[in-house]
Amino acid sequence: MMMRDLALAGMLISLAFLSLLPSGCPQQTTEDACSVQILVPGLKGDAGEKGDKGAPGRPGRVGPTGEKGDMGDKGQKGTVGRHGKIGPIGAKGEKGDSGDIGPPGPSGEPGIPCECSQLRKAIGEMDNQVTQLTTELKFIKNAVAGLRETESKIYLLVKEEKRYADAQLSCQARGGTLSMPKDEAANGLMASYLAQAGLARVFIGINDLEKEGAFVYSDRSPMQTFNKWRSGEPNNAYDEEDCVEMVASGGWNDVACHITMYFMCEFDKENL
């Protein structure tokens, strides 16, 4: 197309040049004949030499994003990175299972023979003496805390919690028995003793262990007309209340014998 444009341009130039040429005839009359020269474009010349490379054109617009290509090949394994910081101490784990039992160790050297029979006997006797002394000391501490007495009786409040049967044995071991309030005077003295000690209740020497409802004193003598049963008592609750307690007001309740509480002992002066 460029060649065609060049040919057309050459033709236009030739025509323009022709129009500028003077006429082939001098000034003549109109009657004279005049010859006209017509210039015809020449043949197409040979292609010229290749011109110099032009300056780069302006960058074009950014084209549309192409389609996502296929995943490339996996790269080679990189070098090992630096060690990170030490993390916080984790929570303590659960205890593991016990390991297998190890093999038995070697046998030890034989021990030195000992005649221990007499030594064991002596140690046993010492243990008994210590136990007896400990019991005596507790009893003395209770006695020092205060006694109550009448013309014929001495009453001791024992601040050791025991079951009914053990309390009775403790009093008997000292030559007495659990306190037996057989009249108003004895009952009042015991109640006052209990209240002044700041205690709420104690075991006393009354029970119906042998026959339900037939209460007797700890010396096995039957109860007479005197009693200080509280309202609704005795009621043998849960069919297991065969022993008796005294409260600070002086009233009596039947209670279970297996519970533990403080107790009061009674001693005859003539037997001391």
Curated annotation (Swiss-Prot):
Residues the record lists as binding Ca(2+) 1: D208, E212, N236, E241, D242
Cited SUPFAM superfamilies: C-type lectin-like (SSF56436)
Residues that bind Ca(2+) 2: E233, N235, E241, N253, D254
Main location as per UniProt: secreted
Signal sequence extent: 1-26
Region feature (Disordered): 45-110
UniProt-listed InterPro entries: C-type_lectin-like, C-type_lectin-like/link_sf, C-type_lectin_CS, Ca-dependent_lectin, Collagen, Collectin_CTLD, CTDL_fold
Listed Pfam families: Collagen, Lectin_C
Ion transport is among the record's keywords: no
Stretches of the chain forming a coiled coil according to its record: 117-149
Subcellular location: Secreted
Residues that hold a carbohydrate according to the record: R201, E241, E245, N253, D254, V255
Tissues with expression: Highly expressed in embryonic murine craniofacial cartilage, heart, bronchi, kidney and vertebral bodies.
Residues of the C-type lectin domain: 150-266
Keywords in alphabetical order: Calcium, Coiled coil, Collagen, Developmental protein, Disulfide bond, Immunity, Innate immunity, Lectin, Mannose-binding, Metal-binding, Secreted, Signal
Compositional bias (Basic and acidic residues): 46-55, 67-76
Disulphide bridges, residue numbers: C171-C265, C243-C257
Domain named Collagen-like: residues: 45-104
Keyword check for Signal: yes
A GO cellular-component term linked to this record: collagen trimer
Gene Ontology process terms (BP): antimicrobial humoral response; complement activation, lectin pathway; developmental process
Subunit annotation: Homotrimer; disulfide-linked. Interacts with MASP1; probably triggers the lectin pathway of complement.
Annotated function: Lectin that plays a role in innate immunity, apoptosis and embryogenesis. Calcium-dependent lectin that binds self and non-self glycoproteins presenting high mannose oligosaccharides with at least one terminal alpha-1,2-linked mannose epitope. Primarily recognizes the terminal disaccharide of the glycan. Also recognizes a subset of fucosylated glycans and lipopolysaccharides. Plays a role in innate immunity through its ability to bind non-self sugars presented by microorganisms and to activate the complement through the recruitment of MAPS1.
Family: Belongs to the COLEC10/COLEC11 family.
Name of this protein: Collectin-11
UniProt organism field: Mus musculus
